[in-house]
Amino acid sequence: MSFMSRVLLGVNIDHIATLRQARGTRYPEPVQAALVAEQAGADGITVHLREDRRHINDRDVELLAQTLQTRMNLEMAATEEMVVIACRIQPPHCCLVPEKREELTTEGGLDVVGNKAWIAQCCQRLGQAGIEVSLFIDAEESQILAARECGAPAIEIHTGGYADAQTIDQQQQELARIRSAVAFALAQGLIVNAGHGLHYHNTLAIAEIPGINELNIGHSIIARAAITGLDEAVRSMRSLLDTV
């Protein structure tokens, strides 16, 4: 694979902060984890600043913005508070995601069709701040078209249905749906990323989809890091993507 066509790896470090918050300690330090991930081959670092600050907090985001050698992708809800924070910190990338306080993790894609006016306004304000905006959406043509109409240059396809499939047939159906959505989005001129629920045994099929720009992967890497160490966990995922 040529370097120019390689699938980028965004490492989500939210669960480093989850471990810290479990005891209310100062450790482990998300910034330290981010730097290790970068050195191990991550192309970027993803963090989700949730409205309830259940893991990543404002201080983490500010320090990461000052210290990362690659780039930060800030996941956030499409709220006034988060848009103001992002415009102040100015990360290179923002991904607008749906958010519910009661959920354990993001449960589905953003409903761009049903909230087009507000999301378009968010995209405009973030874009004017020099931030490349992506929208985390399900693999549906209507949502892809709405994302383009909102002025978002990129989307992130929600791969949760594929990752959570209970049978091989169901998984293959979800994979076909994602492939079709990626091709459709590329035809609309969008940058296409993907993520959610990806791990060492299901990522390759997504990475092999033509036109995929970046995969954002977190929980599985941090889970493996608890056993093997973060450097090895990131290198293993990077090596997996490099086989494409």
From Swiss-Prot:
It is found in: Cytoplasm. 1-deoxy-D-xylulose 5-phosphate binds at D14, H15, R50, H55, T105. The active site is at H48 (proton acceptor), E75 (proton acceptor), H196 (proton donor). Keywords: Cytoplasm, Pyridoxine biosynthesis, Transferase. One of its GO terms (biological process) is pyridoxine biosynthetic process. CDD domains: PNPsynthase. Its main location: cytoplasm. GO terms for cellular component: cytosol. Its EC number is 2.6.99.2. GO terms for molecular function: pyridoxine 5'-phosphate synthase activity. The record marks E156 as: Transition state stabilizer. It comes from the Bacteria. Homooctamer; tetramer of dimers. NCBIfam families: pdxJ (TIGR00559), PRK05265.1-1 (NF003623), PRK05265.1-3 (NF003625), PRK05265.1-5 (NF003627). Catalyzes the complicated ring closure reaction between the two acyclic compounds 1-deoxy-D-xylulose-5-phosphate (DXP) and 3-amino-2-oxopropyl phosphate (1-amino-acetone-3-phosphate or AAP) to form pyridoxine 5'-phosphate (PNP) and inorganic phosphate. Belongs to the PNP synthase family. This is Pyridoxine 5'-phosphate synthase.
